[in-house]
């Protein structure tokens, strides 16, 4: 349903200046049980102001963080960072997982690629990308190499 609306471009994104810490507080209720089950912590390195639609960006960030939870070993840290440069503001989410091979990247943002725990993805990542693109943004991936974890960078262009 949400993807259909995003695909049809019928959503009016209402952008405001929001702190990264505020977005994380909004994400918390959706992920805190999963964090507890896996003994994971979220660490915010740097707080920044992001110009975005709070409701929809919270949804995108929730999906990215749920993905990080799924691929991080129990007891590890998920690092959130944010900042800005002349072209865009950004939020990054770095997991402590095994990392991702570049060949897996093609399936990452495809809808309903088999959602097994091995290397498949559901609707969450494609939805996150559609939300960012709907706001004139994008998502980049820093693979880091096998055993290094993966970093997702949500970009909000100025």
Regions inferred by a protein language model and the residue ranges of each:
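Conserved catalytic submotifs in the C-terminal HATPase_c
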Residues: 14-17, 39-49
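A residue-level detector for a conserved hydrophobic packing site
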Residues: 20, 57-58
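Short helix-loop "hinge" at the ATP-lid/N-box region of the Bergerat-fold HATPase_c
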Residues: 68-69
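Short beta-strand/loop element within the Bergerat-fold HATPase_c
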Residues: 75-87
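Acidic ATP/Mg2+-coordinating residue in the GHKL
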Residues: 95
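Short conserved segment of the HATPase_c
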Residues: 100-112
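Detector for a conserved hydrophobic position within an alpha-helical segment of the HATPase_c
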Residues: 132-133
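Conserved glycine-rich
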Residues: 137-138
